[in-house]
């Protein structure tokens, strides 16, 4: 990342002798379409996730133990059967989501993610909006001031996200228990959706730049650490598609929650294959 403008010499694009161009950009293509699509995608997820987190209903289907990821782990005293494994330590107040201890960390993990940072820097703060498009502001401070300096905490939120992914995996495993299945085992479309969501959450988390640094960072000689080197190469392969996984997981989270909401509300029955 380039240095703040206050530390740059008056040369290059900052040279006083550089030609002054009145137009913000000379690009003739629809460069604004990509930022617009990203803004709409972010807005759709934020609105949906916020509405569902505060709806406080249709988040758990006890017959098949389906629990939406937006309410996991469910720690409120109003969670009922959804928190059999977890202590109900949160008060039942309307302004506090049932998963209030995990949602902030997941939000901060995504907000500080390298891809998401680059995305909303362009679309929300327009810094820059697009290649060869001038920024609307004159001064650039980078990630040296509050609140952007908080971006450096991403490496710590990575560990919390890993713990929450373990919890989501537990939820997906428990959902294979059915009250009607042979030996208590059941398998339906909801299980498929939950497992796919968990797999994609793991792929997104493990493809994180912080994970790449954890596995291979600070190694001066890879040949002396063949296991870590192999893990680093695999994480690096995943890392090349981190942007794709970031968007896929937003979709799988919404799909999983929406499907469980429909089943829990009685709008549709779960398509069962076994039990």
Where are these regions (language model features)?
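Membrane-embedded alpha-helical bundles that constitute the cytochrome b-like, heme-associated redox core
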Residues: 1-275
